[in-house]
Amino acid sequence: MKRAHHICTLTLLLAILSSTGLAQEQLPYIDDGLLDSTNIETLGLKPSPAVKTFTIFSPKDESMHYANGVVMTAFKGVLFCMWQCSLKDEDAPETSVVMSKSTDEGHTWSQPIVIAGANDNSYCTSGGWITTTDTLTAFINTWPNHLEPTGGFTRYMVTTDGCKWSNPEPVRMYNGQPMNGIIEQDPYPTASGRIIGAAHFQPGLHISPIYTHIPTGRYGWKRACFTFHDRNKQSRELEPSIYQRRDGTLVMLFRDQSSTFRKMASISKDNGNTWSEPAVTNIPDARVKQSAGNLPDGSAYLVGNPTGAKRRWPLVALFSCDGIHFDHALLLRAGGKNLQPQRYPGKAKTLGYNYPKSMVHNNKLYIAYATNKEDVECTVVDLEELKQILPTN
């Protein structure tokens, strides 16, 4: 039997009452006819001139052949991209975090360099970024080799110039203890100055929303009041992403490990202190990591593989004016001849457009992902052009 665990502060009763009310909040949804599930290449969507795709890294015979967990950010006019890489297999002992840079808005990229390598005790995966005016912080998810059940902890590295990096240090909770979990890759800064995120805590991988008021995100994290559904070694809900509605409501969307192939959603009305119990939406999913956020006009977007099956193509962006009704869809990458063949075999190298993460920069929506878990690519949506063909407000 699945059990529900409650992770709360001393105001447990108030949190339960609050979450009961939140359960009545409308979940995000799409119209039944928005996507054509019978068209496996495009879901019935057409290509758009507002969309362009660029290669960040393409493997060669002599290079690493596995890539995933691609995350971008912008710092001091330069685009930065991190991802995990290994010789050929997912989460192999040599898995390290590499980084590449672009000075021309993502058209061309530098050769990747290792910023956090594996050692005899653990391997590393990408944990995302937080930027301030003066510093760029990279989060490094660190996985001890023999920990059972599988889990890990989070470290950070800092640069002020994009070249010289500090040594890795533990990310810390509000009480000074190291974060005993794997941070999700896209922390969400709110207008209040609070950063909302999520982490998969030990033992195993059990998700919880977290928040901090520290602009760099290096310490001060607290676990929110939240209900997850326990599947022993991990929670049912995994790998969330966050957007905000115009009234300030926060929405966290999850991958559902119970294989409904629909996204789950949880809602917070108090700036991330308490969250409703996650519920299944009608938004199709490939049981995969996704990316959500807000455009400059306040509308919400969601990027992923809304196939309703394990298939990780096409790559699609969904848009909503109010953060409830997602009524527009944009084809980012199609399947078929538009999906390049996988060239190098390896463990868990899933075909398709894997684990997208996104950011808005200079009125463009950047989506970074790993194609066939070997090519590192980014798709860029010009938001001015998008307005002409796809109303979002």
State each model region's role.
Residues M1, L22-Q24:
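Non-catalytic N-terminal targeting/anchoring module and adjacent flexible stem/linker
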